[in-house]
Amino acid sequence: MVAENQPGHIDQIKQTNAGAVYRLIDQLGPVSRIDLSRLAQLAPASITKIVREMLEAHLVQELEIKEAGNRGRPAVGLVVETEAWHYLSLRISRGEIFLALRDLSSKLVVEESQELALKDDLPLLDRIISHIDQFFIRHQKKLERLTSIAITLPGIIDTENGIVHRMPFYEDVKEMPLGEALEQHTGVPVYIQHDISAWTMAEALFGASRGARDVIQVVIDHNVGAGVITDGHLLHAGSSSLVEIGHTQVDPYGKRCYCGNHGCLETIASVDSILELAQLRLNQSMSSMLHGQPLTVDSLCQAALRGDLLAKDIITGVGAHVGRILAIMVNLFNPQKILIGSPLSKAADILFPVISDSIRQQALPAYSQHISVESTQFSNQGTMAGAALVKDAMYNGSLLIRLLQG
């Protein structure tokens, strides 16, 4: 039995080691082979073999390092080679699809958005494939070697098998085999992740939580959810990685949620619910500066910052409810920081202190007293979240090995 399993075990070790070496070169380059051996804790012979394969595949290149005062032969460092390797990053949201070409450094080559009707005679899968085909036709002169496709979207998703069980907004989606269909259509690997979880990964790799080992990221938008980074890794990355705080009950007598329950956090804290509440309460607050203008998240935040009592009360109410749920999560995960991704962050001076106070009042002091509550660096727009999926696939070696094999 051991002999039968041995080749697979060896392949996994090779993938893990190659990914670790690539990550070090990407993050620290130019870096010498000697330093790679020390940092990766691999034998010099192993480093030599891995680097040789990457050089032959044009995934890394050598660079002379000139050291001040050194008259001898310049040291040779390694850096990643990214410009000739592209991937498609795609994001599906309510009524819109974003498509972008990026190189392996995550640098944007071209990006555009197209309307994606919520209802159509054609199934959503067919329309997605059509948008991808047309995008490649429009930008074929800019396209280098296509390595992969990264897709982020809301819904209930089996990320490991690439199946979208359900999606909000697109009612015709049921057990959509998105990953398999696109891989067969394009011939490249497809990586799929919930948009909130992918955004959490992007912040950890490139943004506000870079370098932190334990992070909770909460998104308050049309939907409410959270992603968790624990010990440097996305929680449940291979399955349903979204933490469904939006469907945690906060009011048993509250409004019915689309999940079937009553009084979920999402029915109180989502952007749509907040604006609905503000509109309702405007009739009882004739002095509010929200009168006489379109009621939007921006106008609500601006009014709150200017001291409008109604706007402040609504935003602080959201903060208290979110903080109460976060206090439970803090007790479970003991994070270093909490990130908030929301259009309500325009009123961060009001929202964030309420969230912080709620956490400190209701979570264990040892876990909560040093936590910082900060805004995300990126917004949940565009295709940056998809870049995190490809970067992660290079770092864990799964995509890297495929590129090395040609």
From Swiss-Prot:
It comes from the Bacteria. Disruption phenotype: Disruption of the gene leads to a threefold increase in malT expression. Disruption also causes the constitutive expression of ptsG. The keyword Iron does not apply. GO terms for cellular component: cytoplasm; membrane. Changing C259S: Strongly reduced activity. The keyword DNA-binding applies. It holds the Pfam family ROK. CDD domains: ASKHA_ATPase_ROK_Mlc. Is composed of three domains: a helix-turn-helix (HTH) DNA-binding domain, a PtsG-binding domain and an oligomerization domain. The zinc ion probably plays an important structural role for the correct orientation of the HTH domain. Homodimer. Homotetramer. There is probably an equilibrium between the dimeric and the tetrameric form. Interacts with dephosphorylated PtsG. Mlc and PtsG EIIB domain form a complex with the 1:1 stoichiometry. Interacts with MtfA. Belongs to the ROK (NagC/XylR) family. This is DNA-binding transcriptional repressor Mlc. It comes from Escherichia coli (strain K12).
